[in-house]
């Protein structure tokens, strides 16, 4: 099972088993936090619903753009606002860096009722239906001879200095292709209040310190627009290793009715969800894994 780290990046299987998180995948993208699998109040059975009936309570990272921040500028913030508005409720946030212990100290401690941006299949929370599907992408400066690349197996990458986040699926492929000797690793799990390794990678590409980088799709699309020159984002659609993941919301295992309610919200709101994601440059895939045009 793959998972999302604290910076929203989907990470490799061995890291998931180690109990690391995220990632709004995650995206990082199944949340990798050590914690109990479900939260229950004393004396309540496993069927008890523990949802605040009047407030859409979200747990998120305080400084993890493009996913979330305390100013509400991330796309997960915007999606939470959308869902809360449709429920006729205000939003309330509990912010905590998404590192080891995040689920235990937030959702399972009853400090919120939903975590945005969890990879489908996360075994630490119950996931809703997915509300978007995306993939890792290669990011590079324009006019560098890398246009049209869809796989890290492309021979044009031989001899290139490529940035990669340690412990993620692309790192495995770089090793398999003999590209790690010249690669530059960036940290996987960090305190986002003081470090921003994925933003650093985008800056390094723009400055010519590395030739290209592999980033989780939402991060690639966001930071590619925020450097000069703007970078090309090439989704990796033809990899031997899995690079694409479906992203959902995470809730407590006991909250079955709440999950069904959120599933209905997702189904009713999909065009609006896609519009918000497009504003942030998130590359979106259809059910067959094909890139979809922006709405």
Residue ranges and their predicted role:
Residues 24-34:
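Bacterial N-terminal signal peptides
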Residues 40-43, 169-190, 232, 264-295:
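Ligand-binding clefts/hinges and TM-proximal coupling segments of bilobed small-molecule sensing domains
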Residues 41-123, 192-195, 279-280:
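Extracytoplasmic small-molecule ligand-binding "clamshell" domains
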Residues 57, 62-66, 70-85, 138-197, ...:
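Bilobed "Venus flytrap"/periplasmic-binding protein-like clamshell domains
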Residues 58, 83, 106-108, 155, ...:
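Hydrophobic residues within well-ordered alpha-helices
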Residues 61-62, 133-145, 225-266, 282-295:
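Periplasmic-binding protein-like
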Residues 81, 85-86, 90-156, 167, ...:
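Acidic, polar ligand-binding/catalytic clefts
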Residues 89-90, 108-117, 160-161, 200-201, ...:
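Alpha-to-beta junction loops
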């Amino acid at each position: 099972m793959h998972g999302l780290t604290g910076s929203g990046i989907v990470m490799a299987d061995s890291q998931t088993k180690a109990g690391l998180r995220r990632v709004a995948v995650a995206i990082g993208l199944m949340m990798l936090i050590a914690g109990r699998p479900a939260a229950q109040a004393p004396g309540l059975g496993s069927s008890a619903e523990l949802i605040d009936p009047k407030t859409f309570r979200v747990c998120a990272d305080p400084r993890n753009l493009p996913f979330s921040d305390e100013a509400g500028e991330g796309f997960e913030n915007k999606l939470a606002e959308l869902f809360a508005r449709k429920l006729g409720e205000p939003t309330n946030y509990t912010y905590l860096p998404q590192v080891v212990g995040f689920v235990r100290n937030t959702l399972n401690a009853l400090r919120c009722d939903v975590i945005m941006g969890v990879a489908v299949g996360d075994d630490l929370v119950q996931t809703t239906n997915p509300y978007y599907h995306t993939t890792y992408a290669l990011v590079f400066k324009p006019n560098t001879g890398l246009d049209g690349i869809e796989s890290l197996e492309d021979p044009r990458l031989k001899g290139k200095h490529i940035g990669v986040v340690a412990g993620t699926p692309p790192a495995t492929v770089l090793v398999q292709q003999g590209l790690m000797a010249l690669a530059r690793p960036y940290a996987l799990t960090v305190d986002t209040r003081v470090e921003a390794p994925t933003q650093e990678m985008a800056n390094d590409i723009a400055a010519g310190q590395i030739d290209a980088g592999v980033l989780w799709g939402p991060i690639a699309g966001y930071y590619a627009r925020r450097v000069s020159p703007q970078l090309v984002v090439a989704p990796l659609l033809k990899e031997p290793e899995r690079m694409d993941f479906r992203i959902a919301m995470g809730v407590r295992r006991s909250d079955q009715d709440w999950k069904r309610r959120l599933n209905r919200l997702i189904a009713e709101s999909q065009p609006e969800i896609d519009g918000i994601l497009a504003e942030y440059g998130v590359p979106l895939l259809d059910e067959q894994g094909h890139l979809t045009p922006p709405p």
